[in-house]
Amino acid sequence: MKKVVKKNQPQRTQRKISLGPRFLRAFEFAAKNHKGQTRKASTIPYIAHLMGVASLVLEAGGDEDLAIAALLHDVVEDCGGAPMLKEVRRRFGARVAKVVEGCTDADTFPKPPWQARKEKYIRHLKAADADTKLVSAADKLNNVRSILSDYRAIGESVWSRFNGGREGTLWYYRTLRDVFLRHERNRITRELELAVQELDALAGGDPTSNGR
């Protein structure tokens, strides 16, 4: 019997992805360095976000290097800055370090002002390579899904958790959505588009969507 594939149905990669001791070491490294950190205004261990991003990357066909980069994508920004990037490169290689660096919007403390930092990151992301875009898009998808969940639970007060407030946060994720979609439509970017669309609907609409 001939198998029927639905039009536009996302297809999982058929390539077998092997995760070995390096991935386990990366998980331990991430758990150690993010120990005590939690998601915004919650008791959820931060490692849950990193695991979620790595899962999305693997589901989209990313290899072990990209899954490791997903686990470590915040370790420079939140756990040590530029010296930490050198440690990532030493332990996990140049490709992983390049993606982690590409997903970092600040490697100094205190961080630069929010708006300027996000605008700079968006400019950087437009020219980033495909590996970085994949991991970054997975990160943003996981973030938007978390915002959606929290919005359903507590409503408009969710925006007080973010430096950009309501308007800044919505602007940031709308802009990122557009950057990713201009580059490629894949499993993650399609899901990000839908998640941002849902967030816009809950928050009162996107005046710049033009019917998106």
Regions found by a protein language model. Give the residues of each.
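Active-site helical microenvironments for divalent-metal-assisted chemistry
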Residues: 2-212
